[in-house]
Amino acid sequence: MAKVVEVGRICVKTRGREAGRKCVIVDIIDENFVLVTGPKSLTGVRRRRVNIDHIEILDKKVDIQKGASDEEVLKALEEAGLADFMREPVRIARITPFTL
């Protein structure tokens, strides 16, 4: 089953300084970028634009509206019982280039 990029879908950042942290898609900017938030008070991921290739979409989803504030996202996560799930970071395997 292909995972759909949609508002409210929970994902894991796979690149950058926030790699391994979970976030929620708040808005779809275009076919390559989405707006995500942790929210920062919960996961440490601040609201920012992210390339779709730099996130791994999970099968969990929360019911939020497009462009929801961090407070609304936090409330939806707590109502769905996913606050503890969001706090746990995911270990990302780092691939180092092969050199001789």
Swiss-Prot record:
A Pfam family the protein falls into: KOW
Entry GO terms, CC: cytosolic large ribosomal subunit
Keywords: Ribonucleoprotein, Ribosomal protein
Cross-referenced InterPro entries: KOW, Rib_uL2_dom2, Ribosomal_eL14, Ribosomal_eL14_arc, Translation_prot_SH3-like_sf
Annotated GO MF terms: RNA binding; structural constituent of ribosome
GO biological process: ribosomal large subunit biogenesis; translation
Signal sequence interval, chain numbering: none
Family classification: Belongs to the eukaryotic ribosomal protein eL14 family.
Protein name: Large ribosomal subunit protein eL14
Species in which this protein is naturally found: Aeropyrum pernix (strain ATCC 700893 / DSM 11879 / JCM 9820 / NBRC 100138 / K1)
Lineage: Archaea, Thermoproteota, Thermoprotei, Desulfurococcales, Desulfurococcaceae
